């Protein structure tokens, strides 16, 4: 049994516009220097831009599907056994899946070239919805790495 105290989870307030915990977490993850209102306005306008590009569908359904397409199922963790370090594939918890998907989408949007962050983010969300783009490539690379190291699954802890 662990000697450490269990970490108390912070209560994430739901988003005011879409009444969604996931949208609120996404805005928090995008935030720089505590400027949440700027982060929220960028996110809302990029979701609206995304809805304009896909005019026939529900914008929140598109947002959630884009996140689901990026969520990784497995990842590799380093495990030291007898002087050698192995990359051991481990299944990812649901909360971490969400966090990684958000992180990868935001990182890909920031790295891409474009005029404004709302346009870059809406393009990356559209790419994620269509299972393309840099964030989807990151997920595929993670899955490929886990598949390549499948022989070391018995080192799981």
Curated annotation (Swiss-Prot):
Keyword Glycoprotein applies: no
Family: Belongs to the universal ribosomal protein uS7 family.
Region forming the signal peptide: none
Family annotation (SUPFAM superfamilies): Ribosomal protein S7
Name of protein: Small ribosomal subunit protein uS7
Assembly and binders: Part of the 30S ribosomal subunit. Contacts proteins S9 and S11.
GO biological process, one term: translation
Function of the protein: One of the primary rRNA binding proteins, it binds directly to 16S rRNA where it nucleates assembly of the head domain of the 30S subunit. Is located at the subunit interface close to the decoding center, probably blocks exit of the E-site tRNA.
Source organism of this protein record: Borrelia garinii subsp. bavariensis (strain ATCC BAA-2496 / DSM 23469 / PBi)
InterPro entries, sorted: Ribosomal_uS7, Ribosomal_uS7_bac/org-type, Ribosomal_uS7_CS, Ribosomal_uS7_dom, Ribosomal_uS7_dom_sf
């Amino acid at each position: 049994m662990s000697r450490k105290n269990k970490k108390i989870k912070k209560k994430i307030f739901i988003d005011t516009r879409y009444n969604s915990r996931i949208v609120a977490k996404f805005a928090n993850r995008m935030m720089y220097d505590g400027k949440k209102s700027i982060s929220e306005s960028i996110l809302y306008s990029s979701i609206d831009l995304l809805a304009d590009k896909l005019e026939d569908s529900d914008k929140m359904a598109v947002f959630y599907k884009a996140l689901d397409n990026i969520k990784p199922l497995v990842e590799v963790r380093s495990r030291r056994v007898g002087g050698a370090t192995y990359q051991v594939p481990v299944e990812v918890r649901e909360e971490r899946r969400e966090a990684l998907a958000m992180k990868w989408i935001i990182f890909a949007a920031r790295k891409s070239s474009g005029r404004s962050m709302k346009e870059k983010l809406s393009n990356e969300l559209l790419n994620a919805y269509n299972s393309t783009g840099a964030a989807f490539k990151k997920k595929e690379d993670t899955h490929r790495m886990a598949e390549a190291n499948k022989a070391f699954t018995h080192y799981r802890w």
